[in-house]
Amino acid sequence: MKKKILVVGKNSFVGNNLYNELKNLFDIKIVNYKSFFQISDYKLSSIDTIINCSISKNYVHKNYSIKNDRDLQICKKIKKFKCKMIFLSSRKVYLSGNNLRENSKLKPKCNYSKNKLKTEKRLSFNLKKRVLILRISNLIGIDNSKLKKKKIHKTFGDIFFQYIKKNIIFDNNKEYKDFISINK
């Protein structure tokens, strides 16, 4: 029997790519964030793993607020079930540098990374060993969705080309950027 996976984030770059990569291997469904909360407890109780790929614009840009923490809201709904949750955190929770490891120094600088670290702690507290935290790098790839203009934040490439168009080459102040292809 195939594992049942539910991906939340039907309109997201990561969610769509994850769904397409896993659809032949698992019994997988993809829904948007609002639709997730309309799923019955009966159906949720049969899910093995939930992966949230949706995010609030306010979560990215503003100070932490529980109402903007979609992962925590999902956690609250699934806490009573036995399903696991995969949390997509960020390598930005670490002090900038190369060769980062799980035990590298944590030093989030922006609201996004500070919020991710707070969510990690809240999910770990609530779900204990039922949460897998992945501190992923910058994901790049071709966005085949029709929602390209619905970006929550700019990528390194977006910023780079924005400056190039203005004939500005910027110094990265020893900030490290790492990129992983979405389809590898």
Predicted segment positions?
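N-terminal Rossmann NAD(P)H-binding glycine-rich loop of SDR-like oxidoreductase domains
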Residues: 3-23
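Structural motif
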Residues: 4, 48-49, 84
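A short beta-strand-loop structural module common to alpha/beta enzyme folds
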Residues: 28-37
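Active-site loop/turn elements of alpha/beta-hydrolase fold enzymes
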Residues: 33, 55, 90, 136-139
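NAD(P)H-binding glycine-rich loop region in Rossmannoid oxidoreductase-like domains
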Residues: 36-73, 77, 92-93, 97-98
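Conserved Rossmann-fold NAD(P)-dependent oxidoreductase catalytic core, especially the SDR/UDP-sugar
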Residues: 73-109, 132
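Active-site helix of classical SDR
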Residues: 111, 115
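NAD(P)-dependent short-chain dehydrogenase/reductase
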Residues: 122-176, 182-183
